[in-house]
Amino acid sequence: MEIFVKRLKELRKDKKLTQMQLSKATGLTASAISAWENNARVPSAIAIITLAKFFEVTADYLLGLSDI
């Protein structure tokens, strides 16, 4: 999950969003986003899809299965 953690942080920071702002924009909890970014929890499939749609990337990209 380290690739997911890295890519989530990069995508969020590229959009200049705080964890709270990302939470409000996606409907995901700020505590969950924090836990994912600290590699303390594994996101659900629904959360991964939600993040992928928000950032306009594929779930495969978020998970490190593709570089596009």
Residue ranges and their predicted role:
Residues K13, G27, N38-A40, D67:
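Residue-level detection of the helix-turn-helix DNA-binding "recognition helix"
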Residues K16-A35:
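Short alpha-helical DNA-recognition segment
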Residues M1-D14:
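A short, Lys/Arg-rich alpha-helix, primarily the initiator
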Residues I46-Y61:
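DNA major-groove recognition helix of helix-turn-helix/homeodomain DNA-binding modules
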